[in-house]
From Swiss-Prot:
Gene that produces this protein: rpl15e
Pfam family, one: Ribosomal_L15e
Protein name per Swiss-Prot or TrEMBL: Large ribosomal subunit protein eL15
InterPro entries for the chain: Rbsml_eL15_core_dom_sf, Ribosomal_eL15, Ribosomal_eL15_arc, Ribosomal_eL15_CS, Ribosomal_uL23/eL15/eS24_sf
Organism expressing this protein natively: Methanothermobacter thermautotrophicus (strain ATCC 29096 / DSM 1053 / JCM 10044 / NBRC 100330 / Delta H)
PANTHER family on file: LARGE RIBOSOMAL SUBUNIT PROTEIN EL15, RIBOSOMAL PROTEIN L15
GO molecular function: RNA binding; structural constituent of ribosome
């Protein structure tokens, strides 16, 4: 029942109590390491909707990624500015997917389950990534999540098999005309 109030507050975070909370938290988050394991999710409603459970084998990691398009260096060799390929270069991967992959590299024994947006400022976006340990007995014995222990689910995030990866690859669209998206 209480999750509903949390969910409503996070729908418009700048118009609710979340703004004051983040006013205190955001400066600390900027000083924290880029990838930091946290005790419990900031958005418990979102985390649980995406599969998080408060039990052994699950961890939540907060990560910070740059905002905006790709940063490319301007080289010294001569050519027209148009042909330099510095401005307006965007990656095929979303910022969220980049965040998930970085976390997965930091925790090689874990599998990424999903992630969600937490906050953003002028320079960074903050995401919380839910990780699952496929070798943990609590996970192996849980009928809801034991599928992640099977070998074909190793490195799912790098193969674009989680939610954001499927979205980036245009797999949300089905039927005739979907070829144009991919």
């Amino acid at each position: 029942m209480m999750y509903r109030y949390v969910k409503d507050a996070w729908k418009n975070p700048k118009d609710s109590y979340v703004r004051e909370l983040m006013w205190e938290r955001a400066p600390k988050w900027r000083r924290d390491p880029v990838i930091k394991r946290i005790e419990r999710p900031t958005r418990i409603d979102r985390a649980r909707a995406l599969g998080y459970r408060a039990k052994p084998g699950y961890i939540v990691v907060r990560t910070r990624v740059r905002r905006g398009s790709q940063r490319k260096t301007r080289f010294k060799a001569g050519r027209r500015p148009t042909r330099m390929g510095v401005k307006k270069i965007t990656t095929a991967k979303s910022i969220k997917r980049i965040a998930e992959e970085r976390v997965a590299r930091k925790y090689p024994n874990m599998e990424v389950l999903n992630s969600y947006w937490v906050w953003e400022d002028g320079k960074y976006k903050f995401y919380e990534v839910i990780l699952v340990d496929p070798n943990h007995l609590a996970i192996k014995n849980d009928p809801k999540i034991y599928w992640i222990c099977v070998k074909q689910h190793r490195g799912r995030v790098f193969r674009g098999l989680i939610s954001e990866g499927k979205k980036n690859r245009g797999l949300r669209n089905r039927g005739k005309g979907a070829e144009k998206v991919r």
